Amino acid sequence: MSTGDFLTKGIELVQKAIDLDTATQYEEAYTAYYNGLDYLMLALKYEKNPKSKDLIRAKFTEYLNRAEQLKKHLESEEANAAKKSPSAGSGSNGGNKKISQEEGEDNGGEDNKKLRGALSSAILSEKPNVKWEDVAGLEGAKEALKEAVILPVKFPHLFKGNRKPTSGILLYGPPGTGKSYLAKAVATEANSTFFSVSSSDLVSKWMGESEKLVKQLFAMARENKPSIIFIDEVDALTGTRGEGESEASRRIKTELLVQMNGVGNDSQGVLVLGATNIPWQLDSAIRRRFERRIYIPLPDLAARTTMFEINVGDTPCVLTKEDYRTLGAMTEGYSGSDIAVVVKDALMQPIRKIQSATHFKDVSTEDDETRKLTPCSPGDDGAIEMSWTDIEADELKEPDLTIKDFLKAIKSTRPTVNEDDLLKQEQFTRDFGQEGN
């Protein structure tokens, strides 16, 4: 058996022990605990990852302590049975229940500390420095987020009586259209505590721990409100219910539904912001909890033009406004991330020219006082046959970045979003959503 097999078998046996323990079948539970601990010990022995090893060790200790407690109880029960009547033995289960509750109270604080420690990395202590103006287009989505996030914090007196800010927003659309980037802008612009989590932060291999993580996440958000919980790829946690769904997945979904509903808690001041590429796979109950469902489509011409300008930034180039509009027109069907890839490739074209050049020539710099070498054609006046390895660092001038570099990059970079996916997104928008442009 591999390490994963030992761990899976150990968790299976320990879960059986927990179920028996809960049902007060302590003798069977004790045996199951020790059978499971044998496998966890083997998993611990062969596990190579230090973090996984620490987690297995902590769980091993926790279950070992419980098994030892059951052992003491069973020994005590046997001793009592020898001295007392059978009726006295029936009362011992009640005593054991009390012991279990006390143990839960003692360990509850420690467990919560561990869970909060695991979630601490989800809190963004430093703002990502992405402003609203850094997000090209998507004016509808930005206005919705300002209404839900900025206004309630800045003007709380506007939200009284039945006028309450939105508590759940779902951003959906094809991959690479800026959903996570919008979330970064929210984190920068909002004067709120920002929790950024994905399914990997909330799903645990240990039975019952995932729903505890969800509960603690919302508890931390309520303690630090105003706050925003951003769940990236929310579909991984809240897919459609079906026969193939695991019990663990159902419990996570149920806990998330309870927390988003705010049952038994004051959740005002907590916004849940979800992002997904496949909204049609969301469970209908979860979909309903997101009061606003905003479609983040592929960028239009104006947005694509702006994206080229933003991605080029302050890199030296000779592109004009008309050149940027041309590039925007040529990239219809490209997502924001596709355009970022195009620009990245184009920015490397001058470097590739340097690497492949066989001739260089002298050119003047902006101050006209120094001369530098730049790649050229062998037929150019003043061309010197040499390689870039023959040139000192302060003597080299990279070629100008031109629209030709971008045209070459566009030819080699195809859009990643297909027509079928867009049709599904548009159908979902007609059925359940609203446009983000």
Curated annotation (Swiss-Prot):
InterPro entries attached to this UniProt entry: AAA+_ATPase, AAA_lid_3, ATPase_AAA_core, ATPase_AAA_CS, MIT_dom, MIT_dom_sf, MT-severing_AAA_ATPase, P-loop_NTPase
Q: Give the compositionally biased regions (Low complexity).
A: 82-98
Which SUPFAM superfamilies does the record associate with it?
A: MIT domain, P-loop containing nucleoside triphosphate hydrolases
Please report a single Pfam family linked to this protein.
AAA_lid_3
Q: Which residues form the MIT domain?
A: 3-80
Q: Name the predominant localization.
A: membrane
BP GO terms, sorted: autophagosome maturation; autophagy; endosomal transport; intralumenal vesicle formation; late endosome to lysosome transport via multivesicular body sorting pathway; late endosome to vacuole transport; late endosome to vacuole transport via multivesicular body sorting pathway; macroautophagy
Q: Name one GO molecular function term.
A: ATP binding
What is the superkingdom listed in this entry's lineage? Eukaryota
- Similarity section: Belongs to the AAA ATPase family.
Assembly? Monomer or homodimer (in nucleotide-free form). Decamer, dodecamer or tetradecamer of two stacked respective homooligomeric rings (when bound to ATP); the dodecameric form seems to be predominant. Interacts with VPS20. Interacts with VTA1; the interaction requires the dimeric structure of VTA1; 6 homodimers of VTA1 appear to associate with the dodecameric VSP4 complex. Interacts with DID2. Interacts with DID4. Interacts with IST1; IST1 competes with VTA1 for binding with VPS4.
Function, please? Answer: Involved in the transport of biosynthetic membrane proteins from the prevacuolar/endosomal compartment to the vacuole. Required for multivesicular body (MVB) protein sorting. Catalyzes the ATP-dependent dissociation of class E VPS proteins from endosomal membranes, such as the disassembly of the ESCRT-III complex.
Task: Give the free-text miscellaneous remark of the entry.
Answer: Present with 5350 molecules/cell in log phase SD medium.
For this entry, the protein name equals Vacuolar protein sorting-associated protein 4
Tell me the organism.
Saccharomyces cerevisiae (strain ATCC 204508 / S288c)
Q: Source gene? A: VPS4
